[in-house]
Amino acid sequence: MALIVVVLFLGGMFTQEYQRGTLVLVLTKGFPRRKVYTVKTMIALLMWTICFWISFGITWFYNSYYWDNGIVSHILPAAALFWLFGIWVLLLVVFFSALFSETSGVLAGTGAILVLSYVAAIFPKVQDFLPVKLLGVQELLLESTAVGDYGQAVLVTVLMSAAAAIAGMLLFEKKRI
């Protein structure tokens, strides 16, 4: 739920500036496009990281106070997997923000990639390689799987995140504003 709110909140981080013309002012003063893209991306990732871990900490302490957290194992790796999934989704948002000039295009592009990932996860041969596997941490929490079982999905997610970040930067450098 929180990730959906973050995507909706950050979906217009570039597109609103395209429409208002505020990026033109910054770029005509000589500020490099690469730095604008990098700073906006880093702020989005930092915001996700801080909000996620604060939320995790509050939930963890709340559950510890009222219930026993001893039944759950591998809680930090499970949280880190969901955090990494959020990083991937945010980098998709940034990529589509560099590609499209409308917030609806950004949200549609990000949603389409997520839906394709969910649909592809139906096929057993590829499901271990997809970023959506990182959302299946319930099995990890109940010790039905090991942390190492998520290694392929983590590697693919990191590579796809890096590709989205680099491609977004290249698109933003060439985009007419």
Where are these regions (language model features)?
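Transmembrane helix-boundary elements of multi-pass transport/secretion proteins
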Residues: 1-23, 121-122, 163, 173-174
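Hydrophobic positions within alpha-helical membrane elements
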Residues: 22, 35, 106-107, 166
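Membrane-interface elements of multi-pass transporters and channels
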Residues: 17, 61-69, 99-103, 119, ...
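Terminal transmembrane helical anchor/hairpin motif
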Residues: 111-177
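Helix-loop-helix units of permease transmembrane domains in multi-pass membrane transporters
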Residues: 13-45
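Residue-level signal for alpha-helical context at structural boundaries
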Residues: 28, 32, 54-55, 114
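Secretory targeting signals
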Residues: 1-13, 37-105, 110, 140-159
